[in-house]
Amino acid sequence: MIQSQTQLNVADNSGARKIMCIRIIGSSNRRYAHIGDIIVAVIKDAVPNMTLEKSEVVRAVIVRTRKELKRDNGIILRYDDNAAVIIDKEGNPKGTRIFGAIPRELRKLNFNKIVSLAPEVL
């Protein structure tokens, strides 16, 4: 469960290392975001000499959360960190590589480019 002011790791090579959620896209008063939700975030830590810089406002899709994800078949997934992938307005990732495992639910939400770049899909 990601809410406003939550810090997340960035799971791609776009140049950002840490982001902070400032808004959840969807309903106007939505409190929590889960895997597959799009958020508006600000970059808190970035790699020097890259396209994305600190204090830049970006959109990101959540790919891992520490809160459990329950599937219909009874499997429960929980990751070690909260992580997101930075995307553009069309939903394509800004980076060219994805780090770490990605849940299968992203394919149902039409983030096929992110799923194809991921090294492992759980």
From Swiss-Prot:
Coiled-coil regions listed in the entry: none
Parts of the chain that traverse the membrane: none
InterPro entries per the UniProt record, alphabetical: Ribosomal_uL14, Ribosomal_uL14_bac-type, Ribosomal_uL14_CS, Ribosomal_uL14_sf
SMART domains for the chain: Ribosomal_L14 (SM01374)
Annotated localization: Plastid
GO cellular component, one term: cytosolic large ribosomal subunit
UniProt GO molecular function: large ribosomal subunit rRNA binding; structural constituent of ribosome
Keyword tags: Plastid, Ribonucleoprotein, Ribosomal protein, RNA-binding, rRNA-binding
Principal subcellular localisation of the protein: plastid
Biological process terms in GO annotation: translation
Top-level taxon of origin: Eukaryota
Family membership noted in the UniProt record: Belongs to the universal ribosomal protein uL14 family.
NCBIfam families: rplN_bact
Function according to Swiss-Prot or TrEMBL: Binds to 23S rRNA.
Subunit record text: Part of the 50S ribosomal subunit.
The protein's name: Large ribosomal subunit protein uL14c
